[in-house]
Amino acid sequence: ELYLISPLTEPERFLNKEYFLTAQQRDIERQILKKIWAERTGAYWFTGLPGTGKTLLLYDIAMKLSGKQRVCMIHCGESKKDWKRLHERLRRVEYLPDSEIGAKCGLEEYSAVLVDEAHLLEPGARELLAGISTRRPVIFSGDCEDVISPDELGESAEMVWKSVPGVQTFRMTNRIRTNAELSVFIQNMMRLTRGKGRRMYPHVSAGYGNDEEEAEKLLKGYLALGYRYFEENAGSSEDVERLVVLLDERYFYDETGYLRSGNRSVRRLFHRLNQAKEELAFVVKKNEEVYSVILGLLQAM
């Protein structure tokens, strides 16, 4: 349990140091800090699937760097209310939302800059931070998005940072927070490939609605069982015990096995699915192809 904490949602436990880093987290931290102490500059990128402890590692590094110098933590995406809770208690780290990144935002004043959810950075912000990394250390943490179609991603942040001269990259592989069963199902669903090991998914379910009315009834049924549902464009990054998502006729699988959508919303869907901690449900509306794929995965045994 002491590996599971999130600095954003459990700030008191983080500040009281009621947590441990895994051996992998400690090794990545050691390599990054060793190079920072020696060179005082450089770009560092670590990535992993949701639930591998990236944010905890990033904050632990921030705590070590902020002992004797000013550091800035940049948060990307819609989790502003989460990190503000920690900001009220952790004064030695200064905060900046990604929306305020610009030539006059004062990042040059800090001895180090850290970026959480870096896969959400806009191209202009990436370029500015890449330039800053030639003069002081910039550490990026972002989700691995390998299972998402390149056509849905466009130019991924990971590919951009790998092209930065001298960038040091790390891949986190040990899932800590995420339910392994749900994580494997999500990966298999996002891209269909032969040869993946079959397994049971007792905490994943699906229902089919032939029309709007049937889908609405199924959705209400899941809500009555304690599942949470978020509108497609809702900005919440909150992890939930039980999650239900709606898949409509926009979704399809392309010839390479990637899940695709008519409006390039698969990336958002991927990150939404990974908010489920214990149970995951799908309501599929007027889309027999996608429903049959999900059933095939669930009935593979």
Report each predicted region and the residues it spans:
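Conserved helicase motor core of SF1/SF2 NTP-dependent helicases
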Residues: 11-22, 29-52, 56-85, 90-93, ...
